[in-house]
Amino acid sequence: MAKRYGPKIEDPHDVLLYPVATEKAMRLMEAENKLTFIVRRDANKPLIKKAVEELFDVEVEKVNTLITPTGEKKAYVKLKPEYRAEDVAVDLGIL
């Protein structure tokens, strides 16, 4: 089976469109060390992981994605325990 590659996106700023700052996103940030982003529709999980690691100088443990009913792609990014999602949120200006 041929290996699939994601889109050729050079700049990590092009992958992550904007952070989500809803009540649920804040609860996930505090309880599960997860950040929530709206990302490009054609971005895959390895590309999202690489973009978050490059932009925020953190290590990512896991990425979950979904397509919202409005057609946007949402990514839940779980950071490794030695990094805090709240610190990244402060840098983003959402906390």
UniProtKB/Swiss-Prot annotation:
Part of the 50S ribosomal subunit. Contacts protein L29. The gene is rpl23. Pfam families: Ribosomal_L23 (PF00276). Belongs to the universal ribosomal protein uL23 family. HAMAP family: Ribosomal_uL23_A (MF_01369_A), Ribosomal_uL23_B (MF_01369_B). Gene3D superfamilies: 3.30.70.330. Keywords: Ribonucleoprotein, Ribosomal protein, RNA-binding, rRNA-binding. One of its GO terms (biological process) is translation. This is Large ribosomal subunit protein uL23. GO terms for molecular function: rRNA binding; structural constituent of ribosome. Binds to 23S rRNA. One of the proteins that surrounds the polypeptide exit tunnel on the outside of the ribosome. GO terms for cellular component: ribonucleoprotein complex; ribosome.
